[in-house]
């Protein structure tokens, strides 16, 4: 039986090398997003103004709700393409892709018509000043067109990731992120507003969609995507898997986009921007961890297809522990220098509203997202995510209800407390409990393997960082903050190398470094 990727360059045989290579390529793409996001967010805030930036953020939050109509098809595409690719069933790969694309085309046309009719009513839900009414409506339609195209063409990206060609998707991300940053910067410098930025964003997304399809044809040349290969039985199979990821998607929308939507309903639109800035900062940085989770997902699917249970347990422990260790120096820096960072990043006026949210959000993100994201992706890759999806749905329902009561009384500070507490209870405790049950691991042991070593390495670094801030590096300029970050990173990673890395992985790292050093 011919493999669906017969013409693709061979991938290294050792699983550790494959995993590390995939993660590194993912990080390359995310690094570009992080750098451009770090530089562009304050520039957007200053050039568009608080309300303009708030409307920009609000529009993107609304668009995320369109994924309700996906019904889990994209996640099912990644799951089943990874499975059939691992077992060498190229015909089934064609059936999955053809069915997913056909369904997505129908949904895209339907969604475009609905939004065109409902745009005036959507606009009336928010506190938008008269001067921005037309701009908001135009931006909403532009982003809707982009989403409809993405619903279709992102399936090709999912298939590329499913066969573990993260080098390809990362190259696409690097190219399109770079072009978007260049175009946005130029247009803002020339004084253009949010509608012109929306047009530029749509054009850049079209470039990404074209590259997705082009590389899909190169990576999976034997895959045939056509209506005649689509089938309702295949769609039902995808729905049966995807309905739980759909529930998970709906829940994540409520958790990620619910706060800005409700803030925009109860408070002036500018508060959406103040909330969005620290959230986006953390999301940009946590995306490093998210890319490890994506690699964990497809590796888990492949291991499950080959019925290799023992490596799964190690994958669960190592992926989460190393995610936490990688992120910890940045968490320490943002915790200790958060206020100074925001004063330099967006100015004192914006920092007064946005900076107090950061430490509250850090608690939730560190313990529930960074340290446990691979847990959720592992459950997804194994197809054992049903109870996790229900837990996310419960978290989302409680969060929306609580936010409806809290935001009018305590504003955006109350909103971030609600989000962080619920995040820790569900994703920080319930998700790892599900993984421990699924893989027959002791819950206490599983949690200990994740948290004890990274936190132990962090204690002396935190003490030194507080001392440094109180004496020689108070954070009055970017050089001081970056120097403090570099110092924390060097100290922490030196300790983490000895404390967090297992002996086998230390040896693997040393071997890799020697090989790089010996290369001409």
Where are the language model's segments positioned?
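Membrane-proximal transmembrane or re-entrant/amphipathic helices at the cytosolic face
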Residues: 1-13, 436-437, 441-443, 465-520
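Interhelical loop/hinge segments that connect adjacent transmembrane helices in multipass membrane
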Residues: 2-19, 212-256, 299, 304-314, ...
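Membrane-interface junctions at transmembrane-helix termini in multi-pass inner-membrane proteins
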Residues: 148-175, 190-195, 216, 363-395, ...
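Hydrophobic alpha-helical transmembrane segments
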Residues: 141, 171-219, 241, 279, ...
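Transmembrane helical elements of multi-pass membrane transporters/channels
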Residues: 21-38, 197-212, 216, 232-302, ...
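Interfacial segments at transmembrane-helix termini and the short loops linking adjacent helices
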Residues: 119-143, 334-370, 439, 475
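Signature of the first transmembrane helix
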Residues: 3, 15-83, 103, 109-116, ...
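Helix-loop junctions and terminal segments of transmembrane helices
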Residues: 71-87, 161-162, 220-225, 278, ...
């Amino acid at each position: 039986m011919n493999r669906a990727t017969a013409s693709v360059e061979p991938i290294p045989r050792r699983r550790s090398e494959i995993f590390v290579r995939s993660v590194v390529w993912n990080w390359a793409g995310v690094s570009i997003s992080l750098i451009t996001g770090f530089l562009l967010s304050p520039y957007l805030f200053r050039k568009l103004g608080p309300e303009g930036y708030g409307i920009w953020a609000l529009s993107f939050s609304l668009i995320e709700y369109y994924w309700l109509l996906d019904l889990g098809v994209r996640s099912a595409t990644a799951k089943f393409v990874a499975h059939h690719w691992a077992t060498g069933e190229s015909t089934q790969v064609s059936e999955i892709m053809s069915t997913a694309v056909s369904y997505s085309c129908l949904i895209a046309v339907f969604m475009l018509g609905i939004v065109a009719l409902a745009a005036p009513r959507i606009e009336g839900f928010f506190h938008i000043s008269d001067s921005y009414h037309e701009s908001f409506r135009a931006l909403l339609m532009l982003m809707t067109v982009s989403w409809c195209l993405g619903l279709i063409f992102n399936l090709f990206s999912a298939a590329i990731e499913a066969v573990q060609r993260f080098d390809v998707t990362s190259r696409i991300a690097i190219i399109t992120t770079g072009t978007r940053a260049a175009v946005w910067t130029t247009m803002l410098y020339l004084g253009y507003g949010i509608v012109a930025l929306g047009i530029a964003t749509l054009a850049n997304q079209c470039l990404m969609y074209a590259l997705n399809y082009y590389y899909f044809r190169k990576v999976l040349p034997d895959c045939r995507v056509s209506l005649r290969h689509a089938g309702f039985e295949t769609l039902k199979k995808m729905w049966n898997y995807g309905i739980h990821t759909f529930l998970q998607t709906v829940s994540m929308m409520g958790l990620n986009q619910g706060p800005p939507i409700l803030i925009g309903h109860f408070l002036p639109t500018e508060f959406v921007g103040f909330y969005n800035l620290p959230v986006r900062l953390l999301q940009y940085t946590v995306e490093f961890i998210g890319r490890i989770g994506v690699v964990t997902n497809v590796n888990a699917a492949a291991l499950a297809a080959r019925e290799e249970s023992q490596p799964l347990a190690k994958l669960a422990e190592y992926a989460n522990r190393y995610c936490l260790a990688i992120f910890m120096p940045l968490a320490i820096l943002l915790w200790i220098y958060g206020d100074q960072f925001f004063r330099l990043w967006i100015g004192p006026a914006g920092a007064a509203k946005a900076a107090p949210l950061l430490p509250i959000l850090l608690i939730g993100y560190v313990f529930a997202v960074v340290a446990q994201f691979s847990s959720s992706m592992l459950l997804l890759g194994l197809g054992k995510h049903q109870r996790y999806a229900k837990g996310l749905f419960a978290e989302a329902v409680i969060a929306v209800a609580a936010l409806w009561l809290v935001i009018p009384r305590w504003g955006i500070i109350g909103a971030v407390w609600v989000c962080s507490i619920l995040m820790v209870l569900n994703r920080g405790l319930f998700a790892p409990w599900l993984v421990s049950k699924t893989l027959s691991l002791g819950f206490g042991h599983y949690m200990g393997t994740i948290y004890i070593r990274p936190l132990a390495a962090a204690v002396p670094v935190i003490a030194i960082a507080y001392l440094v801030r109180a004496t020689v590096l108070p954070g009055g300029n970017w050089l001081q903050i970056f120097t403090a970050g570099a110092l924390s990173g060097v100290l922490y990673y030196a300790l983490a190398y000895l404390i967090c890395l297992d002996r086998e992985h230390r040896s693997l790292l040393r071997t890799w470094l020697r090989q790089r050093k010996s290369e001409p």
